[in-house]
């Protein structure tokens, strides 16, 4: 029998409430987090019938990783989210778990290629990794080994509220391809999409420890054929997981390129400890991804990093949007310390949804990201604080108090004599507690310094400084947009070609800010600070 998850049952199991207080210390006010319990990777991102679906790795029974299920939230604007009942609940939850639902993706099967649709209803189909903690014979008659990871599907006929697992034939991709079948414990994270040109479904999965991606095609989402492999290339410091494959416009025109994203854990960007996400630009013909020559580097220590900070991982893209509207969401945490961050009764938040595009920057095709939230509804029209300085002398100047949730737009001349220019954020009145976001002129790097950001006691690697390359724009200016929430800072540099995302855990009264120029004066400075209101109200 297929397994139907009734919303009323799951609602009771997961403890979903209609009214909830989202005002706990460190609770992000415009970043999604579950009401309670553990969350990690975003899954099944799908825009369908005017609704954005965000599924996510979720433990319905506690604040640490375990009992992994698919949580679910919906939004009409990528800003205001409503948590829904658990979509896929770990099989056997409450007694002996025999199957967990690891990361995956979802599509709307508008042509009913799967045959799951009934009475004219479009089936939504989720493809995910089944993790089997014990060896067993499945309802499909297939046998699996202890700790096996396989790819399975489920479908929904009520726009994603309840799901039926395809027990008659799951898993639909039971094992890694030959000659990699010994990797059955590390074969995961399918990203599925419809490829218009070939009129086929395509899925890319990770053979994690080999730093390889396997690409399959299908006519019906049930029967899959291996068509190519990708990797290993570039960063290989940890396992490859949570891959993506999607097409984006180039320079806002009709030309397009394809992008592969892949998470690494550990082995993130230089200067970080733990997880990170790299990307490749190239061409995809429906079966094979061919990377551009300048997107692949000799050796395995250099990469194109999607984010240069420590807290952006498992980034996933939305199906159901045009390529010009492509949106990604990343998990704003890090496996190095994610289980120990000082939040309760939840752990983890998602980064700001980001609009992705490709632009030619410094003669190279580059992934650029910009915040996609509906800012007009939550951001103040008039700035809390606005100043311009033709010359900002060496030293510091206090800005007005900023509160806990705000956006800073900061620009200045790259020809300044200063060594660094920064803004101290979420600072105490005496600035012994602060987070610094700024620019190193000699190195041409953005930096984010959280060494004195508040509570850093839970992990000995947390109090660190992070850097990302940023060349000044064609007018000789450096431009930063900085989004601050109660427990996070996200820096978007230039056109979005460099981003830095980091969690912080400051004191409640750390609401001060100041501008700091070191080693000389900074020229042509402009700073604007806008308040951002809570999306939970």
Curated annotation (Swiss-Prot):
Entries under SMART domains matching the protein: Glyco_32
Domain of life where this protein originates: Eukaryota
EC number: 3.2.1.80
This protein's record includes keyword Plastid: no
Activity over temperature: Optimum temperature is 60 degrees Celsius when inulin is a substrate and 55 degrees Celsius when sucrose is a substrate.
GO annotation, biological process: polysaccharide catabolic process; sucrose catabolic process
Signal peptide: 1-19
Catalytic activity: Hydrolysis of terminal, non-reducing (2->1)- and (2->6)-linked beta-D-fructofuranose residues in fructans
pH dependence (record): Optimum pH is 4.0 when inulin is a substrate and 5.0 when sucrose is a substrate.
Active site, renumbered: 41
UniProt-listed InterPro entries: ConA-like_dom_sf (IPR013320), Glyco_hydro_32 (IPR001362), Glyco_hydro_32_AS (IPR018053), Glyco_hydro_32_C (IPR013189), Glyco_hydro_32_N (IPR013148), Glyco_hydro_beta-prop_sf (IPR023296)
Molecular function via GO: fructan beta-fructosidase activity; sucrose alpha-glucosidase activity
Entry keywords, A to Z: Carbohydrate metabolism, Glycoprotein, Glycosidase, Hydrolase, Polysaccharide degradation, Secreted, Signal
Protein name: Extracellular exo-inulinase inuE
Gene this chain is encoded by: exoI
